[in-house]
């Protein structure tokens, strides 16, 4: 599911995960069929794995150990 862009400039540390999370929410049945907002669908538990990956990426930006290990995410 991750998308890798060679020609696209860097948009930040967690830009790839954030973009994939947004695409997952917009393509979910919750948004398309039920007509709910992506925020409501995220609270209901859709795209949970990407939400957790985005959280881990953001948390690794604040972690001092990430200097040695590198940031999580793509």
From Swiss-Prot:
Residues found modified as Phosphoserine: 37
Function text: Involved in an early step of the mitochondrial complex IV assembly process.
Keyword field contains Nuclease: no
Motif (Cx10C motif): 30-41
UniProt KW keywords: Disulfide bond, Phosphoprotein
Assigned protein family: Belongs to the PET191 family.
Secreted listed as a keyword: no
CHCH domain boundaries: 27-65
Cellular compartments per GO CC: mitochondrion
Membrane-spanning parts: none
Residue pairs linked by disulfide bridges in the UniProt entry: 30-57, 41-47
Motif (Cx9C motif): 47-57
One GO term of the biological process aspect: leukocyte differentiation
Domain of life: Eukaryota
Gene, per the UniProt record: Coa5
Name of the featured protein: Cytochrome c oxidase assembly factor 5
């Amino acid at each position: 599911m991750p998308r890798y862009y060679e020609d696209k400039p860097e948009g930040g540390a967690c830009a790839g995960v954030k973009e994939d999370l947004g695409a997952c929410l917009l393509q979910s049945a919750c948004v398309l069929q039920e007509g709910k907002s992506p925020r409501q669908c995220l609270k209901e538990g859709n795209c949970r794995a990407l939400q957790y990956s985005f959280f881990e990426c953001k948390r690794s930006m604040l972690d001092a150990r990430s200097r040695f290990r590198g940031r999580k995410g793509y």
